[in-house]
Each structure stands twice: as C-alpha cells, then as structure tokens.
C-alpha cells in the first residue's frame, strides 16, 4: 500500500507507543486521525508537529470503553476525511495485578479497553476499510502469547486480541488484511527501575531492550509490504519467546 495521502486512524495515539506509531505514519504523508482519551496534550502536540511539517492531522477524543463510542469513532473519521484506509488499534491499559489481587473494576477496565474496544472499533470501521481495500493492525503483546502472572488481566486481554485478529482476518477478507504486532520490551512500563530494565535485557537473546522504532518497522512492513499477509501475529521481541 502506498501510504502518502491515505487516511489512518491510530487509537491511543497521544502517548507512548501509540504516539510513536502515529508519528511515523504522519511522517510518511498519511492523513492522520489521532485518537485520545486521557492524553489530549500529547495528541495535540503530535497533531501540531505534523501540521507544522506540512501534513494533515486531526485529534478525536473518545472513551473507547464505551462500545458505542468505539464503534462511532471510525465513522467520525470518515465523516471528517471521506474515507478510512488504515486502522491501528493501539489504545490499551496495563496494570501490575496478579490473579488474586485483580478486582472486578480492574478486570473490567482492562478487558473493556484492551479487547472489547478493538472489537467494536473494528466493527465501526469495517465498511470503510472494505471500500478502501484497507488494512487493520492490532497491537497485541508478548503477554498474549505467554502467561504473565503478574499482569493477569492484561495477559488475558492480549490473548483475546490475538484470536480476535484471526477472526477479523476471516471476516474482512478478501478486501481487508488484519494482522497484529506483539512487541516485547520496546517500551517498558514507566514504573520499571534500572534493575528491572536490566533483567529484561538479560532475559532477551539479543541481550538488549528494543525501542519504539522496532514496533514502527513492523507496522510499516505490514502496511507497505505485507499485502499477502493476513491473520498473523508479528512478534518483535528480540527472541524472548525462544527462552
């Protein structure tokens, strides 16, 4: 897919990895819809930087834990730009909570944003993506491919994203490709100290942490070159799953 001039919606585009993904698409000339909820400042800063560089970007606020809002978000983007070519489902929350310590409220928060919102955002985007013969990329995680007991709800939610990606790849074929990226330690949780970061690096066969640029490279492969790839999970982890 030629990206320049096409429309991309990135959920959770105001901070951390979502912002890095959105910025990369804007830098390649995509018309950018930057979704945010609690990160309005970061989204606005990214929008302004893209516009200053000669690009086009608009911020869209929405609480994606509301299924109606999640389904409506892509329709708002189509109303603004007239089309939607790419959907990147990146919005997520991650809490360090074991199975025993997870409350019903925490469970709902994680599953509602990390999994349910992806389903309904995809549902709202389906007709526009089909019309554009577009692409969808869901941000999964290593925690969806191996159990992370300390992040119980998060691990379960991302496993759901992996299976949802395969379901959507079937449902939206042949017009739309749907894939997922499962990053490893490309952007570690903000609360991790130096010891935890070092432990992560040592547990990776490449003996280093990754960076957001590694996830960006995976996204660009799927969008620009992965035209015959659908229903797959691209793992970007420096080999951690080989342990």
Model-derived segments and their meaning:
Residues 127, 169-174:
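Alpha-helical segment proximal to the catalytic Tyr-Lys
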Residues 30-45:
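Conserved glycine-rich Rossmann-like NAD(P)H-binding loop of the short-chain dehydrogenase/reductase
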Residues 173-177, 229-231:
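Short, small/polar-rich loop/turn modules that mediate ligand/substrate recognition or access, typified
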Residues 128, 212-236, 241:
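C-terminal substrate-recognition "lid" of short-chain dehydrogenase/reductases
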Residues 7, 14-15:
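Conserved glycine-rich cofactor-binding loop
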Residues 98-99, 106-111, 200:
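Substrate-binding pocket helix/loop in short-chain dehydrogenase/reductase
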Residues 122, 157, 165:
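Active-site helix of classical SDR
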């Amino acid at each position: 897919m030629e990206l320049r001039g096409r429309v991309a919606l990135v959920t959770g585009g105001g901070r951390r990895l979502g912002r890095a993904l959105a910025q990369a698409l804007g830098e390649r000339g995509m018309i950018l819809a930057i979704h945010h909820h609690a990160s309005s400042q970061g989204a606005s800063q990214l929008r302004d930087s893209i516009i200053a560089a000669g690009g086009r970007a608009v911020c869209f606020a929405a609480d994606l834990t509301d299924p109606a809002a999640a389904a409506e978000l892509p329709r708002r983007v189509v109303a603004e730009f007239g089309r939607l070519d790419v959907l990147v489902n990146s919005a997520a929350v991650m809490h360090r909570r074991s199975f025993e310590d997870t409350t019903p409220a925490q469970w709902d928060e994680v599953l509602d944003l990390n999994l349910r919102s992806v389903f309904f955002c995809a549902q709202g985007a389906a007709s526009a993506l089909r019309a554009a013969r577009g692409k969808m990329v869901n941000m999964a995680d290593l925690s969806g491919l191996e159990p992370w007991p300390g992040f119980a709800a998060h691990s379960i939610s991302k496993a759901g994203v992996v299976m949802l990606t395969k379901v959507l790849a079937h449902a939206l074929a042949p017009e739309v490709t749907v894939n997922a990226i499962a990053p490893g330690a490309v952007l570690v949780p903000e609360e991790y100290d130096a010891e935890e970061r070092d432990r992560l690096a040592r547990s990776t066969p490449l003996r280093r942490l990754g960076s957001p640029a590694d996830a960006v490279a995976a996204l660009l492969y799927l969008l620009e070159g992965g035209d015959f790839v659908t229903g797959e999970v691209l793992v970007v982890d420096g080999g951690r799953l080989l342990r």
